[in-house]
């Protein structure tokens, strides 16, 4: 009995010692979650990178044929036609020095998640089976990023891409989803997006200067927004959705601009166009380019059916021609008060009632003005106050309603000849000549029955 009592006391002492040790340890070092990870932060389900952890970037150009990477990764061109080819490449390479071309790919998904950098171009083309492209770790494409002829492609996921020289996507007709860090990607040469189902093309905040900006034939595209400042070559937007709103709030200088089929154009900082500027078949009501000062080629404002207001108050020089035609809601051309010179010809046609150029001193080409309105006064052009015409291109024609005035001038503006024609009378004479032709025809089969002749005569004189 005493033995049992002693054993019980021993167990009690051991248990008490363990309890005290555990309690003291807990007080000194409280329990922590594994790695101190908070799985969700402020309700955000995305895992966030620590602030002091730099984003991975690689300079592919620093790698060379002597770098300690697989010989496979140093090839100038990799052609991938199957998932087996791709597995073999990605099993050995995170970085490739040359270009990657995917063509006639045999799978629905192109998984490039193992690649981090491409030293040449990434070209994915002519793969009608391809539905999705994913490249979750791809950071840099030193050359062209091209998608072309991918008729089943729906989504592109490239969330970490920070640089490519040019972006060219053509004939990807059902592409409607792109996961891309467009606010941080840098593109230094061309942006061409054609024949997609994208609804928005936005941001490109780091894109400051490029050679080409061409967005066309994207039938569902409703918004284009970019912070680009200079376009060294062609800036073209056309054949997208009629509701398209184009906003380039920082654009200052462009080589050449053609804008069609838009409902809004916002270019508040545009100062200089080195070549031509054309707005054709748009749906906007107002065109405000109040900071534009010089156009190195032709200015064309053509067939914009809703246009009622234009602001070009600071434009002083057009080195090419000036064409304003078929803008059926535009009632006057008085929006160029500081224009001093037109280096080419003038062509105006519409229903405008007034034309006014307060500062215009010289038109180096000819001029043709035609308005269906009888209110337009051609005399201010045909009877210059100082006796010399500002038109120096040889001939001037102004048609107001049914009246036509013409001038022939020398290169110094001296008027050689004036002309006037009543187009109403000319129309009546033309009708009479047609009737006379049939009435006096020597061929009996061509002669008119007197009753029919009388009916034709009345109809033609009335109409």
From Swiss-Prot:
The keyword Endoplasmic reticulum does not apply. It is found in: Cell membrane. Residues 441-463 form a propeptide. SUPFAM superfamilies: L domain-like. GO terms for biological process: ascospore wall assembly. LRR repeats lie at residues 127-147, 185-206, 207-233, 251-275, 302-325. One of its GO terms (cellular component) is side of membrane. Glycans are attached at residues 256, 314, 327. Keywords: Cell membrane, Glycoprotein, GPI-anchor, Leucine-rich repeat, Lipoprotein, Membrane, Repeat, Signal, Sporulation. It is a lipid-anchor; GPI-anchor. Gene3D superfamilies: Receptor L-domain. The keyword Secreted does not apply. Residues 1-25 form the signal peptide. InterPro entries: CWI-Assembly_Regulator (IPR051648), Rcpt_L-dom_sf (IPR036941). A lipid is attached at residue 440 (GPI-anchor amidated asparagine). Redundant with SPS2 for the organization of the beta-glucan layer of the spore wall. This is Sporulation-specific protein 22. It comes from Saccharomyces cerevisiae (strain ATCC 204508 / S288c).
